Protein backbone atom coordinates (compact mmCIF):
# COMPACT_ATOMS: atom_id res chain seq x y z
CA UNK A 1 0.00 0.00 0.00
CA UNK A 2 1.42 3.38 -1.06
CA UNK A 3 1.39 6.48 1.14
CA UNK A 4 -0.80 9.27 -0.21
CA UNK A 5 1.11 12.52 -0.89
CA UNK A 6 4.39 10.67 -0.23
CA UNK A 7 6.57 13.66 -1.18
CA UNK A 8 4.69 15.96 1.19
CA UNK A 9 4.92 13.43 4.03
CA UNK A 10 8.68 13.10 3.44
CA UNK A 11 9.01 16.87 3.74
CA UNK A 12 7.09 16.87 7.00
CA UNK A 13 9.35 14.14 8.35
CA UNK A 14 12.39 16.29 7.53
CA UNK A 15 10.76 19.26 9.25
CA UNK A 16 10.07 17.26 12.41
CA UNK A 17 13.67 16.00 12.51
CA UNK A 18 15.00 19.52 13.10
CA UNK A 19 16.70 19.71 16.47
CA UNK A 20 16.48 15.96 17.01
CA UNK A 21 19.31 13.41 16.94
CA UNK A 22 19.26 9.64 16.89
CA UNK A 23 20.85 7.73 19.76
CA UNK A 24 24.15 6.37 18.48
CA UNK A 25 24.55 2.60 18.47
CA UNK A 26 27.76 1.30 20.02
CA UNK A 27 29.89 -0.48 17.44
CA UNK A 28 33.51 -1.55 17.49
CA UNK A 29 35.46 0.64 15.03
CA UNK A 30 36.63 -2.29 12.89
CA UNK A 31 35.50 -5.01 10.54
CA UNK A 32 33.85 -8.16 11.89
CA UNK A 33 36.91 -10.34 11.21
CA UNK A 34 39.17 -8.00 13.17
CA UNK A 35 36.62 -7.78 16.00
CA UNK A 36 36.69 -11.57 16.21
CA UNK A 37 40.48 -11.55 16.62
CA UNK A 38 40.36 -8.86 19.30
CA UNK A 39 37.63 -10.69 21.20
CA UNK A 40 39.52 -13.97 20.99
CA UNK A 41 42.66 -12.33 22.40
CA UNK A 42 40.67 -10.69 25.21
CA UNK A 43 38.94 -13.99 25.96
CA UNK A 44 42.24 -15.87 26.16
CA UNK A 45 43.57 -13.25 28.57
CA UNK A 46 40.55 -13.66 30.87
CA UNK A 47 41.12 -17.42 30.99
CA UNK A 48 44.81 -16.90 31.76
CA UNK A 49 43.92 -14.55 34.62
CA UNK A 50 42.31 -17.55 36.32
CA UNK A 51 45.48 -19.65 35.93
CA UNK A 52 43.73 -21.94 33.49
CA UNK A 53 44.67 -23.24 30.06
CA UNK A 54 42.78 -22.03 27.02
CA UNK A 55 42.02 -24.61 24.35
CA UNK A 56 40.18 -23.50 21.25
CA UNK A 57 37.01 -25.39 20.35
CA UNK A 58 34.01 -25.06 18.08
CA UNK A 59 31.74 -23.70 20.81
CA UNK A 60 34.08 -20.81 21.58
CA UNK A 61 34.57 -20.09 17.89
CA UNK A 62 30.84 -19.83 17.23
CA UNK A 63 30.19 -17.71 20.33
CA UNK A 64 32.98 -15.28 19.44
CA UNK A 65 31.77 -15.01 15.86
CA UNK A 66 28.24 -14.21 16.97
CA UNK A 67 29.39 -11.54 19.43
CA UNK A 68 31.78 -10.03 16.86
CA UNK A 69 28.89 -9.78 14.42
CA UNK A 70 26.67 -8.12 17.04
CA UNK A 71 29.37 -5.53 17.73
CA UNK A 72 30.02 -4.58 14.10
CA UNK A 73 26.80 -5.19 12.14
CA UNK A 74 24.58 -2.38 10.89
CA UNK A 75 21.52 -3.24 12.95
CA UNK A 76 18.96 -1.47 15.11
CA UNK A 77 19.71 -3.72 18.08
CA UNK A 78 21.69 -2.35 21.02
CA UNK A 79 22.43 -5.26 23.31
CA UNK A 80 23.38 -8.91 23.71
CA UNK A 81 21.97 -11.74 25.84
CA UNK A 82 24.49 -14.46 26.70
CA UNK A 83 22.34 -17.39 27.81
CA UNK A 84 22.99 -21.02 28.67
CA UNK A 85 23.97 -23.38 31.47
CA UNK A 86 26.35 -22.73 34.34
CA UNK A 87 30.09 -22.34 33.92
CA UNK A 88 30.31 -22.37 30.13
CA UNK A 89 31.99 -19.06 29.35
CA UNK A 90 29.36 -16.32 29.52
CA UNK A 91 31.00 -14.23 32.24
CA UNK A 92 34.38 -14.71 30.60
CA UNK A 93 32.93 -13.19 27.42
CA UNK A 94 31.42 -10.31 29.40
CA UNK A 95 34.73 -9.48 31.07
CA UNK A 96 36.62 -9.84 27.78
CA UNK A 97 34.32 -7.30 26.17
CA UNK A 98 34.73 -4.90 29.09
CA UNK A 99 38.52 -5.05 28.87
CA UNK A 100 38.45 -4.64 25.09
CA UNK A 101 36.30 -1.51 25.27
CA UNK A 102 38.58 -0.04 27.93
CA UNK A 103 41.77 -0.69 25.98
CA UNK A 104 40.47 0.51 22.61
CA UNK A 105 39.45 3.96 23.96
CA UNK A 106 36.44 4.35 21.64
CA UNK A 107 35.04 7.85 21.22
CA UNK A 108 31.30 8.34 21.55
CA UNK A 109 29.41 9.45 18.42
CA UNK A 110 27.90 12.89 17.83
CA UNK A 111 30.60 14.75 19.77
CA UNK A 112 31.23 18.39 18.94
CA UNK A 113 34.56 19.21 17.23
CA UNK A 114 35.64 21.01 20.42
CA UNK A 115 34.79 18.14 22.75
CA UNK A 116 38.42 17.58 23.77
CA UNK A 117 39.84 14.42 25.32
CA UNK A 118 37.88 14.13 28.54
CA UNK A 119 37.31 10.57 29.74
CA UNK A 120 33.57 11.33 29.53
CA UNK A 121 33.91 11.40 25.74
CA UNK A 122 34.98 7.75 25.59
CA UNK A 123 32.84 4.68 26.06
CA UNK A 124 33.13 2.95 29.42
CA UNK A 125 31.77 -0.49 30.31
CA UNK A 126 30.42 -1.19 33.80
CA UNK A 127 29.73 -4.74 35.02
CA UNK A 128 27.48 -5.41 38.00
CA UNK A 129 25.90 -8.57 39.38
CA UNK A 130 22.10 -8.87 39.36
CA UNK A 131 22.05 -9.39 43.13
CA UNK A 132 24.04 -6.18 43.60
CA UNK A 133 21.51 -4.28 41.50
CA UNK A 134 18.73 -5.32 43.86
CA UNK A 135 20.71 -4.12 46.86
CA UNK A 136 21.63 -0.84 45.17
CA UNK A 137 18.00 -0.19 44.30
CA UNK A 138 17.01 -0.62 47.95
CA UNK A 139 19.80 1.46 49.48
CA UNK A 140 20.94 4.07 46.95
CA UNK A 141 18.44 5.13 44.29
CA UNK A 142 20.79 7.78 42.86
CA UNK A 143 23.43 5.13 42.25
CA UNK A 144 20.77 2.90 40.69
CA UNK A 145 19.81 5.70 38.29
CA UNK A 146 23.46 6.23 37.44
CA UNK A 147 23.74 2.56 36.50
CA UNK A 148 20.62 2.88 34.38
CA UNK A 149 22.28 5.72 32.45
CA UNK A 150 25.73 4.10 32.02
CA UNK A 151 27.07 4.15 28.45
CA UNK A 152 27.52 0.38 28.42
CA UNK A 153 26.28 -1.93 31.14
CA UNK A 154 26.97 -5.61 31.72
CA UNK A 155 24.65 -7.43 34.13
CA UNK A 156 25.91 -10.79 35.35
CA UNK A 157 23.63 -13.66 36.41
CA UNK A 158 20.20 -12.25 35.70
CA UNK A 159 17.66 -14.62 37.20
CA UNK A 160 19.58 -15.34 40.41
CA UNK A 161 18.18 -12.24 42.12
CA UNK A 162 14.74 -11.99 43.74
CA UNK A 163 12.40 -10.69 41.04
CA UNK A 164 10.46 -8.71 43.65
CA UNK A 165 11.74 -7.02 46.80
CA UNK A 166 9.92 -5.13 49.54
CA UNK A 167 11.24 -2.04 51.26
CA UNK A 168 9.15 -0.44 54.02
CA UNK A 169 6.00 -1.94 52.51
CA UNK A 170 6.80 -0.85 48.96
CA UNK A 171 7.29 -3.51 46.30
CA UNK A 172 10.11 -2.99 43.82
CA UNK A 173 11.19 -4.87 40.71
CA UNK A 174 14.81 -3.71 40.24
CA UNK A 175 15.85 -5.68 37.15
CA UNK A 176 12.60 -4.99 35.31
CA UNK A 177 12.93 -1.31 36.16
CA UNK A 178 16.57 -1.11 35.08
CA UNK A 179 16.01 -2.90 31.78
CA UNK A 180 13.00 -0.71 30.99
CA UNK A 181 15.02 2.46 31.64
CA UNK A 182 17.86 1.30 29.42
CA UNK A 183 15.44 0.27 26.68
CA UNK A 184 13.82 3.70 26.71
CA UNK A 185 17.23 5.41 26.49
CA UNK A 186 18.49 2.91 23.87
CA UNK A 187 21.66 2.22 25.85
CA UNK A 188 23.93 -0.73 25.05
CA UNK A 189 23.34 -3.56 27.51
CA UNK A 190 24.78 -7.07 27.82
CA UNK A 191 23.61 -9.61 30.35
CA UNK A 192 24.35 -13.22 31.21
CA UNK A 193 21.73 -15.66 32.40
CA UNK A 194 21.08 -19.34 32.98
CA UNK A 195 17.40 -18.79 32.15
CA UNK A 196 15.76 -20.09 28.99
CA UNK A 197 13.96 -17.47 26.86
CA UNK A 198 10.55 -18.74 28.02
CA UNK A 199 11.72 -18.49 31.64
CA UNK A 200 12.76 -14.87 31.09
CA UNK A 201 9.23 -14.12 29.86
CA UNK A 202 7.67 -15.94 32.81
CA UNK A 203 9.90 -14.17 35.33
CA UNK A 204 9.90 -10.61 34.00
CA UNK A 205 6.65 -10.49 32.04
CA UNK A 206 5.61 -10.03 28.42
CA UNK A 207 6.42 -6.31 28.35
CA UNK A 208 10.09 -6.74 29.29
CA UNK A 209 10.48 -9.90 27.20
CA UNK A 210 9.17 -8.14 24.09
CA UNK A 211 11.49 -5.20 24.68
CA UNK A 212 14.45 -7.54 25.08
CA UNK A 213 13.57 -9.19 21.78
CA UNK A 214 13.69 -5.79 20.11
CA UNK A 215 16.87 -4.49 21.72
CA UNK A 216 19.07 -7.58 22.08
CA UNK A 217 20.68 -10.32 20.03
CA UNK A 218 20.62 -13.72 21.72
CA UNK A 219 23.82 -15.82 21.87
CA UNK A 220 23.07 -19.31 23.17
CA UNK A 221 25.82 -21.24 24.97
CA UNK A 222 25.21 -24.92 24.26
CA UNK A 223 28.44 -26.33 25.69
CA UNK A 224 28.79 -28.01 29.09
CA UNK A 225 30.49 -26.47 32.11
CA UNK A 226 34.22 -25.82 32.03
CA UNK A 227 34.44 -25.97 35.82
CA UNK A 228 35.78 -29.51 36.06
CA UNK A 229 39.27 -30.93 36.08
CA UNK A 230 38.61 -32.63 32.76
CA UNK A 231 37.24 -29.56 31.03
CA UNK A 232 39.24 -28.07 28.20
CA UNK A 233 38.87 -24.47 29.28
CA UNK A 234 37.88 -22.47 32.35
CA UNK A 235 35.15 -19.91 32.71
CA UNK A 236 34.77 -16.89 34.93
CA UNK A 237 31.56 -17.23 36.91
CA UNK A 238 29.03 -17.50 34.08
Where are these regions (language model features)?
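Hydrophobic anchor at the beta1->P-loop junction of P-loop NTPases
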Residues: 82
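Conserved nucleotide-sensing/catalytic segment adjacent to the nucleotide-binding pocket
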Residues: 112-183
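Hydrophobic positions on the alpha1 helix immediately C-terminal to the Walker A/P-loop
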Residues: 93, 97
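Walker A/P-loop NTP-binding motif
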Residues: 99-102
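Conserved glycine(s) of the Walker
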Residues: 87-90
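Walker A (P-loop) ATP-phosphate-binding motif of ABC ATPase nucleotide-binding domains
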Residues: 79
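A short, basic N-terminal segment
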Residues: 1-76, 229-238
Amino acid sequence: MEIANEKRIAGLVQFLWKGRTMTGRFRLPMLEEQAYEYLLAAYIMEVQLRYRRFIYNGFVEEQLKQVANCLTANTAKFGIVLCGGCGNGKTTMLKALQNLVRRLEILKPNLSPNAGHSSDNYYSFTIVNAMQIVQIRKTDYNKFCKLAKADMLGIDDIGTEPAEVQDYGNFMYPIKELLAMRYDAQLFTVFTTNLEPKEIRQRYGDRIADRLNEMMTKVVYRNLTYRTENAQMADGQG
